[in-house]
Amino acid sequence: MLGLFKSVVYQLNTLILLLPLAIAGCQSSTPEVDPASLVSRNDTQLVLNNAVLEQSNPQSNTVWKIKADNITYSDNNQVAILDKVVGNLFEDDLVILKISAEAGKIENNGNVILLNGTVIASDPRNGSVVTSESIEWRPQEDLLLIKEKLEGIHPNLEVTAGQGKYFTKIEKLEIEDDVIATSKQPPLQLTSDRLEWNIPQSQIVSPGAVELVRYDQNKTITDRLVSDRAELNLTQNLATLNQNIELISSSPTLQIATDFLTWNYQERIGSTDRPIQILDRDRQISLTGNQGEIDFLRQIAKLQGGVKGIDRQKALELYARNLTWNIDTEKVEAEGNIIYQQTEPKARLTGDSAIGTLKNNNITVTSNGTQQVTSIIDDTP
């Protein structure tokens, strides 16, 4: 009977062998089984109990190894049906992927393995774990096709999505459909329709529209950002956003608009070398510049390259080459080609630098650092 079984297995796939030995990874060891108990045979089917299968490449290196409680071959011996599956994927004799599932099926000479029912795939190289109800494993392509809702877990990141792919060679997870990625420290949540996670590089790329929400330790939202594209470096806590960016902060209550932003979501510091607008809706203050940086924790904004500040409540405008704004106190310091004008009383000042506060129209403009520039009052009715 055992000789007949070996003959049938080799006809199915010369690279698949029955091995009564231990399997590494998903189970630390497999008890030795009496060969006589391994095989039962109906008229048209071969059934293996507590069996181990493995496939090797032309260089005789093990590609994968699978253990199942029961293995039933189809009538033509082209498909193997598996029950209670654990297995490993190898590269250079090292385990690079561990899998387990309630059920499975081996097709296409061992090049396609379908797994179903609480499928768990873990990569010991990076500590990531993916779970789903259905995964297609293609060992020769170094690919997992995740066809149903999935959850990915990493020491500092969790992701969920409708479907995805995991490229085992490069340790990259691509997911799509209702993507949510949550970072634990600092607390950050990303939502998108598509996401690429390069795990060894600790990099996340959202090639489409994305929303980032930052939380404090009390799970209160501090910042919300949207853009057309985003890239995150999880090690540096740095997000790089492109096109149609809007940042809304709750403390202080500001709205930022630009087309490019580098955002340290740990330190809450944003910087850009593109035109930027900062809007304080409560106080009706607007600042625009050709580049700038804002530090929300210190409540300091610095704009350069041609700056315009408007306080609509006080009906005043301030123009400068560079400007620093203390968001809390409304103190401003500006330099270069200063123009300050107000409506009540009507005045216009020019000079090289300016300092003061917007909330009480108290702005001092100087020229060459010493000479006070005289106000020009227009009394024309």
Regions found by a protein language model. Name each.
Residues M1-P381:
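Mature-chain termini and adjacent capping regions
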